[in-house]
């Protein structure tokens, strides 16, 4: 019997596999993931500095442990490049072809990356999974000043976390207040006040148009041509659902 294939080992993918195994212990089950397949709680990514936890400490179980618990095969560091719904096959980025009985796409979303000019864009990080968090945590070691692009939910969560971790944080938000699309003005004002009490500096109005290197530091260039000094930058301006492969199927 061809397996059920779940693409994605995040909260949705692993929870689906756990619930399915409560109903059926025998059906072949395979999970595919673009990362290392560790099980973790994604909301914890924006609490790691407050709790002083590394990526390894945020992980709940590795892929081998999850495979054993779920009686499943887990393929790590692979991506689906094409789906043939008529043949019920997947083509992976390594050229492998897999046949499925049923297919579940639980692969989440990609970060939206703004078009930025300058030679410092390689110091702009997005944190969307545990490997991203690990890379950022290693990169920020020994640094002090963080500029966050975006004052929405993720931007404010990281501003809070990094401030608690002892970093100086500036947040650039063009729309004039934190969480502008999620909260009414009184609640937004309360969030702003609480974060400013932690030392967070909000810069409302202009957007970020570039990041330039200035020796060992960075200069974040805003649309009004003002500049903000930084050691490292986080882009937190939103996510886009991963739908292109499914649309092409």
Regions found by a protein language model. Give the residues of each.
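Rossmann-like dinucleotide-binding cores of NAD(P)H-dependent redox enzymes
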Residues: 59, 145, 154-212
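A general structural signal for well-ordered alpha-helical segments in protein cores
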Residues: 13, 42, 63, 113, ...
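Generic structural signal for residues in well-ordered beta-strands
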Residues: 29, 72-74, 124, 169, ...
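Beta1-alpha1 glycine-rich phosphate/pyrophosphate-binding loop at the start
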Residues: 2-72, 161-182
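Residue-level detector of alpha-helix initiation sites
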Residues: 10-11, 36, 109-111, 131, ...
